[in-house]
Amino acid sequence: MTSEDQSLKKQKLESTQSLKVYLRSPKGKVPTKGSALAAGYDLYSAEAATIPAHGQGLVSTDISIIVPIGTYGRVAPRSGLAVKHGISTGAGVIDADYRGEVKVVLFNHSEKDFEIKEGDRIAQLVLEQIVNADIKEISLEELDNTERGEGGFGSTGKN
């Protein structure tokens, strides 16, 4: 690891409670909340795009962000797009040190192509707290047994 890499790794991020937004072009738009108590900030498409039926696409927002310290940004579906058009999001974690363009992966679960116009709300950005825990390797004996044990994937009930 070079000294430049080490200094970047040790870089201290500015302490803030603001979501900072850089508009990368005139097509970028500052995220907005649909209501005062909305959990997420609406993200806007910076381009016209088509998400094919049963397909996926990567949609540009032309923004970069800095999330508040102790959080990350999660790109989540908009409920109206999910219910009315079968549109969901994927691969949506934006780390606190990411400075590239925010892009949105959209999946179309419907039978019809989904048309996006420049300026359409396509997803929402939810800020979530994160715990950066130390990692400690343990022995099998230290792995406490629980009532559930190794049961997974529906093991706790049928419904």
Curated annotation (Swiss-Prot):
Alphabetically list the UniProt keywords: Hydrolase, Magnesium, Metal-binding, Nucleotide metabolism
User: Under which main EC class is this enzyme filed?
Assistant: hydrolase
- Pfam families noted in UniProt: dUTPase
Is Magnesium included in the keywords of this UniProt record?
Answer: yes
Single GO term (MF): magnesium ion binding
This protein's pathway reads:
Pyrimidine metabolism; dUMP biosynthesis; dUMP from dCTP (dUTP route): step 2/2
Q: Which reaction does it catalyse?
A: dUTP + H2O = dUMP + diphosphate + H(+)
Q: How does it assemble?
A: Homotrimer.
Q: Which cofactor does it need?
A: Mg(2+)
Please name the CDD domains in this protein's record: trimeric_dUTPase (cd07557)
Example GO BP: dITP catabolic process
The UniProt record lists the keyword Mitochondrion: no
Q: What EC number(s) does its UniProt record assign?
A: 3.6.1.23
Where does the chain bind dUMP?
Answer: S79, G92, D95, Y98, K103, R148, F153, G154
Reported function: Involved in nucleotide metabolism via production of dUMP, the immediate precursor of thymidine nucleotides, and decreases the intracellular concentration of dUTP so that uracil cannot be incorporated into DNA.
Q: What is this protein called?
A: Deoxyuridine 5'-triphosphate nucleotidohydrolase
Which family does the record assign? Belongs to the dUTPase family.
Specify the species. Answer: Candida albicans (strain SC5314 / ATCC MYA-2876)
